[in-house]
Amino acid sequence: MAQRAGTPTLRFFEWQPWAISLGHHQKTSDLDEGRCKADGIDIVHRPTGGRAILHAEELTYSVVMAAGRKSILQVYNDISRALIRGLALYGVDAALQKVQPNFSEEYRSPSSVPCFNSSARYEIEWEGRKLVGSAQRRFHEGERDVVLQHGSILCGPAHMRLVDYLAVTDPAVRGQVRLTLTEKTADLGMITGKTVEREKLAACLRRGFEEAWGITWEERSVPKNFMHKGAGLP
């Protein structure tokens, strides 16, 4: 990844089979592993932080780039604005979250296990509801920093099924998590009232980066051996 960071790299992909990814430091014990296995839901750990996501009806994006002199939030903001421009081209008016929540307090609650139960600063929302969940990590390569940022763009409501795979035995807690996800998330299908055209969406997002960053992407195929590394990550 670091070797490719001389040129920014943008990828879009979907998950088959569906999978739950956990943040780098999140415990697998947060999940009901038996039920995940029975339903054919893979479990992976991301190299980035954050909380659990059920990768189902979504389009996942991944950006690898040199950080330069920019801070984590500056890079996050740059990528988010490009995504917002792409979503606008698709016909969706999204916005940035302006306030950073106190995650040290939020993570004490059992309802904090799902990523989409809260929005960080510069994450993308629609009418106050989280539409894109993202995470970033920096890797040191000699004297430079290389950024990996990836995220889930919700296309349908299947992400809410994550509640069924949590290691939560109290029905009241499970119900609260489900309610919070319902109230705090939005998906493109719900917003547009139509089935999301993934290829069209990816094309709009690609163009959004080009317009926001003043660049032109060069399309390249992904090496076959790369597809077998990291359980589909980044």
Identify the function of each model-found stretch.
Residues 114-136:
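Aromatic/basic-lined ligand-recognition segments
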Residues 56-58, 119, 148:
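Short, solvent-exposed loop/turn segments at the edges of secondary structure
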Residues 84-110, 137-234:
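Long, positively charged amphipathic alpha-helical accessory segments at protein N-termini or as interdomain linkers
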Residues 30-71, 204:
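A glycine-rich, hydrophobic loop/mini-helix early in the fold
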Residues 16, 56, 126-128, 143:
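Short acidic-glycine loop/turn motifs at beta-strand connectors
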Residues 1-47:
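N-terminal low-complexity, intrinsically disordered segments
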Residues 21-23, 30-32, 132-133, 157-158, ...:
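Short helix/loop capping segments that flank catalytic or ligand/cofactor-binding pockets
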Residues 60-121:
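Internal, conserved structured core segments that host functional sites
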